[in-house]
Amino acid sequence: MKTRAKRFVSALLAGVLCLSLLAGCASKKKELTRYSTVFYDVFDTVTQVIAYCESEEEFNTQMDALHADLITYNQLYDIYNDYPGVTNVKTINDNAGSAPVEVDDRILSMLELADQMYQTTNGKLNIAMGSVLNIWHNSREAAEAAETDADNKLPTMEELEAAAQHCDINNVIIDADAKTVYLADPEMSLDVGSVGKGYAVEMVCQAAEARGLTSALVSVGGNLRAIGVKPDGSQWTGGVENPWSSSDVYTSDSMLDGAINMSDMALVTSGDYQRYYVVDGKRYHHLIDPDTLFPAAYFNGVTVLCSDSGLADCLTTGLFCQPLEDGMKIVESLDGVEAMWCTPDQQVITSSGWDSHLKK
C-alpha cells in the first residue's frame, strides 16, 4: 500500500508540475495582432493580405517574402514581357518550333497541372490556345484605346479558325528530366492566364506557411486563399461577387447572399463581368470556348471552392466553358471540390456539398 501511495503522490506532483509548465508557456505566448497590406504590382491586379502575427516586424518580414514570391511568379508566367536573367513563358513562346527551352521548376509544375486539367475539364481548359486568345486580347486592347464603343470590332471567324489550327496541346512537349518545354508548332503559343495566378497564389501561401505564418487571408485579384483559422478559432470568410450587380467596390448588392467559411481553402471565381469589351451593345468577355472560339455563353459566373488555389483557378475556367450537366459531373467526381454556377437567367446552382461550407 505504501508503494502505491507513493506512486500516486509522485504522479500527482508530476501532473501539477506539467500543468504549471503549460500555464507558464501559455502566459509567455504572445497574443497575435491583426495586420493588413496591399500590393498593386503583380498579375495586373490588386493583392490584399490580412494576417495575424506576434508583431508588426514579423508581419512585415512575412509580407516582404510573400510579395517577392509573387513578383517572381508574375515574371515567370508572363507571356508579354521579358525580364533580365529570367526565362519565362514568353521565352517558350518566342522559341516555338525552334528549340526546347530549359525552364524553372515552377514553370514545369504549373504546366503539368494545366496538362492534367485539360483532361479533367474535357479539353475546355487549354493553355495551348494562345494564338486564339491573343486575337481576342488585341481586340480588347484596341477597344480600350478607342474613343467610343462604336469603333470596337470583333475578330473575324476566318482569322479565329486559322489560329485554332495551332492549339493542339499535344504539341506542347514537356521533358521533366531535362526540365525543358518545346512547342512543336512554330505558330502556336501558350497562354497561362487560366492557371498561372491561381497556381502562384497556392505556392506563395504554402511558402508563407513554411515560414511560420499560421493565420492569413490572401486575395490576389479576387483569388482567395485562407491560411489556417483566426486566433479565436473562427474560420475566415469569403464572398462570391454578384455577376448581375458587380461593382469595383464591395457593397451588400455586389455580393451574393451566403458567406463561405474558409480554413486552408481557396475560393476562385471566373465571370463574364471581369474583363470584356462591348460591340453593338453586347459584352464580349475573355473566357473563350475552345469549340466556338467565341466567349462562352453558358454562365455569368462560376465559383470553385477547394483546398488548392491552382486547381480552383483551372476549374473555374473549364467549368465556365461547358454545360452545367457536364461541369456538375466533373465537380461531383472530385474529392473536396465544390462549385457554384450563376446562369444568364439569374439562377444560382450549387454542387451537393456547397451549403455545408456556408457560414451559419
Per-region residue spans from a language model:
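Mature catalytic core of soluble alpha/beta enzymes
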Residues: 2-11, 18-360
